[in-house]
Amino acid sequence: MNHTAEKLLTFIKESPTAFQAVEMMKTRFTENGFTELKEDEHWEIKNGGKYFVIRNHSAIIAFTVPEVSSDVFHIIASHSDSPSLKIKENPEMVENGYVKLNVELYGGALLAPWFDRPLSVAGRLIVKEDEQICEKLVIVDKDMLMIPNLAIHMNREANSGYKYNVQKDMLPLYGLESAKGSFFKTVAEAAGVKEEDILGHDLFLYNRMPGTVWGSEEEFVSAPRLDDLQCAFSSMEGLIAGKNEKSICVHMVMDNEEVGSGTRQGAASTFLRDTLLRINLGLGRSYEDYLISLAKSFMISADNAHAIHPNYPEKADPVNRPHINAGIAVKYNANQKYCTDGISAALFKELCKEAGVSCQVYVNRSDVAGGSTLGNISNTQVALNTVDIGLPQLAMHSPYETAGVKDTCDFVKLAGVFYA
């Protein structure tokens, strides 16, 4: 198996929710000499230093400061969250001899693939420990849940456009009636805490099926949450491998992109603005110096793109239709759902040439409305010259997505050059 793809799959396996993804990045950065900063403490920023700061345990910004002073930020933005089903408060529902869990939809999930596959629960618990309120990350590492389909004999419309009702059709089966009252006991045991100490929770279902590399030449990688952990992983690896000599290099991974980014840990928050300003102040510069730095800086907003589908080619633009493993996709939208313009696209294409990787173009069909992503949302807080890009993938927002091995390697390589 390709080494980079193997590392990506390990990263994804250990990151069933945004909380674990950020914890994995924290571990990788700490292992590579980065120092953690706290938002509620004073920062000491030095030339040659490597740092990271976390907000809500689900968003992270890591950065390096070159030995020789620089006032330019090179930023790659991605996101830590993926569509899922979130556990509601008081989740156990006992009906007809079964225990189900009450869930609600998080983000724009593709629902059908969630059926008839082993699932479990991960996220965080808020607990009282030694008279202190603290977070405990938790992964229930066993096949614990399943959302069973209704047999075709009882739903003749199943293959002809049946519309799923999340409140009725998507409730996962936890056990027989004898399992009543045991859900939080199971979660508490997995977290190493007492059930009675749980004060709150942010728990999500996750697909237990492991990722894999496949295809006639092992050219495809399939796994849960490729959107957008594939980009987050590539940016992280690029920052660790980069020389970091020419600019202040910033790896930014925000939460809640799939639900609009309008949280304190989302792209619409002040997290990036606060961090860049504090870096600038920590280096002894004025607020005007900070504004000058922003005018010189560049951001790559990295969120996966739709590859042309083998069975639905008509869903793609007739000309601009990205292929898997044919290059990083530069994303355009006339209505500014993406930040890419002629200038930022030209700069990115030159960066691709420097890195020795290919790029291609993604544009929606003119009769299909596209969604926005990190770039234009974060620009409402920090005005930066920005290009929107993505790695082409299939089955976006499915609990099991497919992308390209080569594209992952190319983005790691490009990120390393960008972070030179």
Model-derived features: positions:
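N-terminal hydrophobic/helix-forming segments and targeting peptides
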Residues: 1-420
